[in-house]
Each structure stands twice: as structure tokens, then as C-alpha cells.
Amino acid sequence: DKYSREKLNGGLENLSSYYLDRGYIRFNIDSTQVAITPDRKAVYITVNVTEGEKYKVTTVDLSGDIVVPESEMRAYLLLRDGQDFSQVQVTNTEEMITQRLGVEGYTFAKVNGIPEIDDEKKTVALKFFVDPGKRTYVRRIEFRGNTKSVDEVLRREMRQMESAPASSAQIEQSRVRLERLGFFKEVKAENVEVPGTDDMIDVQYTVEEQSSGSIGASVGYAQDAGLILGANLQQNNFLGTGKQVGIGLNSSKYQDLYSFNYVNPYFTEDGVSRGFSVFYRSTDLEEINVASYTTDTVGGTMSFGYPISETQRLGLRVGDHRPEVRAAGA
């Protein structure tokens, strides 16, 4: 592998992490030497370390302003008495408590795990200091990058509301809902501090539009039907409104079929969807010597979808069709 200072530093960091995550809290890299071989085609790397001994955790406590019930906060303490000290578990605990405070609106909370080391007993007493800061509220929710989709299509997916406490869970849930629409290649959420305040943020969602439609054509052949041609066009974000519109056409020697479908995913503000489809089919059975009559059929369906959870819907669909038989050539 080709030598680079950046790779060496990365390797040294990985080495430190390996030891710190396995109880060696006093691990230290004493020195590093890099020497070039006489033929100048390779290098020797010598790393001198002090491994130290393993340290056990004795106590794990919380301190500071505990705004969430302490019994609940303790569930996020990943280290327990008697376990080997692990820096990654300290970091994960800090992140989990910070995220939990973010759910309650404490966007700028800080959590620091402070180890008290007893070198004689080879133990560590951990104390997590919690500073929730002020509860934060959302001033505005803004959208960027939606060059095709109108703002309302994005805004109705929001679970985080303006003027409400900023919940990291609701902000993330809103981001996921935008992704599920299928209109965007990427969705990012960013909390932006409002100048002159320490308890207000703006939430900015940046999206990258992608194609939300499809067009297709088909050609086939069957002995009785002859050449079969088909075409369809489906747009799931029609004119940027979030509504679904589709048309289809199939034609052969003895049958023609035309169809149209439409879905409004927000027929009501609560997210109840309504859709309908219609079709017309003309079949000339005389063309394939089956019968001396033609059937014209008109039909359609109407459907409703009711959201019962974030990812599930209850659907209802009804349909009907009316065939008309007439003599061939009539």
C-alpha cells in the first residue's frame, strides 16, 4: 500500500480506539518513526505504545439538569458496574441521551461523560453531566430545491409543526415521509439557528427532484390477435401537485383497450386518498372467427385509502362495468 501521512494518522486513531474500547483507558502512543529503505522503494513504520492495564467501571451516574425522568434516562446508560471501560460506549451514551432530549425540544442539549480514574484500583467512575439548555421552538419550516413540486406537497407531509417545540424525532419523521413520496433523489434536514435568539430555529429541508413518471411501449404478436401494440404513460407527481395520473392504450387485430386512472393522495387534509379509473374496451370477435358480434365494454372503479399508521393504509374499492353487445358491422 502506498504510504501517506493521512493513512498513517487514520491507522493510529483506529489503534487508539481499539484499546480505549476494551478497557485500556491509559493507552498512549508514545512515538512514531517513519524510515525510508535504502533503495527508497518502501518505508519502515515503528509505533511505540504504552498499553497499560484494563480498567473496570465502578459506578455510572447522571448529574446536571435532568429534565426527562431519571429512570428513563438511565435506560440509555450503556455501561454497567463491573464492565470494562469503553470509550465508544461513553460516546454512544452521550449521543442517545442527546437525541432523547432533542425529542423533547432541547435541540442544543449537551451531554458529557466524565471519567474519574482511580489508577491504584484500576477503576473508572463515570458521571454523565447533562445540560439541556433552553427548550427550542420552530419559527419557520422552509423547503429548498423543489423546482417541480409545489410547497404544499411537501408541507402536508410535515409532522413537525411551526411554532411548536422542535422535536428531533418529528423533524426526522418528516424527512422520512418526504423520502417515501418517491419524488426526490435525496432529502436533507438542517436546523438553522435564528440570529438574536437562543430558543428558536428554522428547519430547512433540501430536496433533489427526480423523475416521478414513466412512459412505456410494447409490441407483440399472437397468431389470432396479430400485431399487438401497447403504450402507457404514468405520472405520480402530475404538474408538481402530488396527484397521480395515468393513461394506457392497447390495440390488436380484434381488440382495442383505452384506460385512464387518477389518484388524489390528499382528498382530505387528514390524508384520506381518493382515486378512480375508467376504461373502454372494444372486442370484435368476428375478426378471429369466434362469433359474429362485437362487444363494447365501459367500466371503472373508485377507491379510498385511509391512513391507520405512518406506514399502513386501509383501502376500499368498488367497481362496475357495462358490456354492450351488437351485431358485427352494426
Locations of regions flagged by a protein language model:
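Gram-negative/organellar outer-membrane beta-barrel architecture
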Residues: 6, 164-330
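Interaction-mediating elements
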Residues: 1-181, 185-203, 207-212, 226-228
